[in-house]
């Protein structure tokens, strides 16, 4: 059940385009301690004015519980999502539980968690969605509807989390490798 009680104090934190959920957690953790101290001081001083949560919502906005996150919920949908949607999906699940995908590399299918990515603008229409473009040294780009997603940090099943440059030292993509 959602906490619908009155709000006695709050602080807003900007979420940068590069922040992942771990970064936001850390920002809130630092501010939370200060806010608790400040709130207790204001309660003691009698300067708190509680505000109903409904009064804080924009017109037509409704509080909804966050959905439960399951393993399948964390799978990257390369086919039906835009570059920004995929990028935000990865950020929203990093570092835990992490977005994941399947790598089809030749006749092998490997589960891969994606922890960090970047948006890369460009015309991706020449490639099937999910196609991996790599220089075999330091870059993994994935063709999506409206551009590319550059993978920066990943974890192959059974291995440790690593930067793409480290991953590429010991891995070779097959000719038609793709994420699906």
Predicted segment positions?
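Donor/substrate-binding cores of folate-linked one-carbon enzymes
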Residues: 1-65
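Internal anion-binding site segments
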Residues: 58-180
